[in-house]
Amino acid sequence: MSPSLTWHDVIGQEKEQPYFKDTLAYVAAERRAGKTIYPPQKDIFNAFRLTELDQVKVVILGQDPYHGPNQAHGLSFSVLPGVPAPPSLGNIYKELVTDIPGFQRPNHGFLQSWAEQGVLLLNTVLTVEAGKAHSHANLGWETFTDRVIAALNEHREGVIFMLWGSHAQKKGRIINTERHYILKAPHPSPLSAHRGFLGCKHFSQANQLLQQQNQQPIDWQPKLPAVE
């Protein structure tokens, strides 16, 4: 792949597609009607802003954004500083404590430092109405995020996809396992984490796979931005 390829190059044309315009128009109309939609408009595409196509090493696929106040900011599983880690993220931390030597459970749930190291924190659906999980399913976001996965599949090699739960695993069916790595486990939600997410060791496995490709491993200890 030429290092100059960007998200704009490979999925920029999606913005011109009717399905994509319709999705954005629906979300804009809901906001105008006074509904609270998460994340804020400026944050919807943060995952792509923070992790450029040629920087992606790992993909962690989520479902739809958190639907509580001040949680979602465009990165799957991550919440804004000052907001307690939701239960699924709590289980991710629990797994990291046992999987990564020296990992300390943070007192926040802000995963931007992962994104800045090449972990694409991608939700399948990029918006949600406050308090209503899956309220923006089947609007068109799934088509867009399928194109994102297809672009990674085609234009990159050696990317590690962490697919947690049946939803993510279905979404990952198009990934060519001769070019990429797939790590599967149950979802980290409290309903399913004990069925094999806890103990999956995906984080250490990902770092081993990166090192085998002579790439820098991920520092999985989430860091808050330095206060200016």
Swiss-Prot record:
Biological process (GO) annotations?
base-excision repair, AP site formation via deaminated base removal
InterPro entries in the cross-refs: UDG_fam1 (IPR002043), Ura-DNA_Glyclase_AS (IPR018085), Uracil-DNA_glycosylase-like (IPR005122), Uracil-DNA_glycosylase-like_sf (IPR036895)
Recorded catalytic reaction(s): these are: Hydrolyzes single-stranded DNA or mismatched double-stranded DNA and polynucleotides, releasing free uracil
Keywords associated with the record: Cytoplasm, DNA damage, DNA repair, Hydrolase
Give the E.C. number(s).
3.2.2.27
Q: Which compartments does it reside in?
A: Cytoplasm
Superkingdom is Bacteria
Instruction: Output one GO MF annotation.
Output: uracil DNA N-glycosylase activity
What is a single cellular component term in the Gene Ontology annotation?
cytoplasm
- What exactly does this protein do? Excises uracil residues from the DNA which can arise as a result of misincorporation of dUMP residues by DNA polymerase or due to deamination of cytosine.
Q: Which PANTHER family match?
A: URACIL-DNA GLYCOSYLASE
The family assignment reads: Belongs to the uracil-DNA glycosylase (UDG) superfamily. UNG family.
What is this protein's record name?
A: Uracil-DNA glycosylase
Gene that specifies this protein = ung
